[in-house]
Amino acid sequence: MNFDKLHHLFEKIKKEWKEDSHVEHEFRNKQYTTDLGQISMEIPFLHNKYLNHYTDLSQVKTSLEFELRKTIKEKREYYGGEAEARTYAEKPFGSSIKTSEKMRVYLDADEDIINIEAKVKYVEMMLNYLDHVLKQVSARNYHVKNAIEWERFINGN
């Protein structure tokens, strides 16, 4: 998955949460209990929606981590002079690297590795956002309960 797709997906998720998290402070026709009941009934569906997003992104992260491990192995072979001859024909490399310190420098600066690591970090940021969204969805039960208790208090019940 490229950065544009990840960014588009993240913007879509944030837009969905902005819409889903909005609660009218002025409840329709002052029917507090009905509106709060509706909000309460939507909580499991919201939780499922954002849990699915979280699960999908966790799978993307796992795939990227596997891709990163594979790429690091290929780059170690390339920089160490152990890759296939056709690899060097396509992308020549002057000499093989013998020290682990120098290998680390080349791996840390490799563009392919940097791009995959950047995607992993971006997906981690998205997962962190979704983790907070899921906590807010779970907390909605308590917010609805408090609002209903407030309504009872105001009405003298």
At which residue positions do the language-model features occur?
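Short, charge-rich amphipathic alpha-helices with coiled-coil/heptad character
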Residues: 20-55
